[in-house]
């Protein structure tokens, strides 16, 4: 249905989800009606589906890697339109599930947290599920997807074929791709995996919602509040049992229990004294990225015998991309995630100050007082974007739109 494709394209453009290249490719795919052939291929249960490519990408701010999957471009376009249309099933999810939903997400979670009376006086449990997407049990997931059979047997059949292939392509040293047999779970990185992730724990979400328990889930991050320590332990035991029943594992290093009045973190934010700011971990992780990039560019500048401003400009360009562009394999944009939801600029000021130190280091190769001869105005001329200024610029724009 071309009208659906046109609506999908407009939706993506309005939300600035597409680069110029991506928009051009999608327009071409629609105008040439390549979706007609692909629709027939996906409906043909006798046709073997393309295999996804398995890749490892850096896990922000650490030496760890995370595994993502991606299908060939045209197959990926088909999965994107399917993901877009899956929003018709949004009503099956509880209101305490905030991930990957249209016009409902992290800002609503933060608003609920901020407007819940007495939340600072409650006990809090933060739980993270280890390798959530790729460790999802496919047979359990297919059972949970069975509600699709009533109205869309073909869609269920396609998902069954996607999920049970247990095979992927991996690039080897000489540039070739080899087949590997493996359990892929919901395949993090493919367009429909967020829907699978929401479905997989929807019964757990519904359990806590039905009982009026203050519970928040965003994908693999879960936050629960209780009035007493004993009550929190009861909720914890129930949650852990449900996680085990789904054959998932908790990440023990990321479990956090907070008593009333203590600061707690969720989704990269921290809540302290009624204010929402960048979490300490978010700040540390970003500083680590800045330091590594500055040192790498300084080494490159010296090796090439270039002037210091070349390294500084390279660093600024990299940071602008990090803060204001989409993250690889996702539609995540750092500034769009954090700026609308924080209520103080304290964390941004800390990052700005550190970023300016790194820019000056790129020029001189040292961290010392003499670096201040490199003026703020000079950094602006090189393209530096002050985070605090960008934050308030966004607030002004938002107020005008109201």
Question: What is each PLM-predicted segment?
Answer:
Residues 1-37, 366-376, 380, 392-402:
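Non-catalytic, polymerase-adjacent accessory regions of viral genome-replication enzymes
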Residues 39-63, 157-176:
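Reverse-transcriptase-like RNA-dependent polymerase core
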Residues 50-52, 217-220, 253:
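Short Gly/Ser/Thr- and Asp/Glu-enriched loop/turn motifs at secondary-structure junctions
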Residues 63-94, 181-209:
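Conserved pre-motif C helix in the palm subdomain of viral-like polymerases
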Residues 76, 80, 177-181, 206, ...:
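Right-hand nucleic-acid polymerase module
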Residues 78-137, 379:
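Active-site-proximal segment of RNA-dependent polymerases
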Residues 116-219, 223-242, 248, 258, ...:
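Conserved polymerase palm-domain catalytic core
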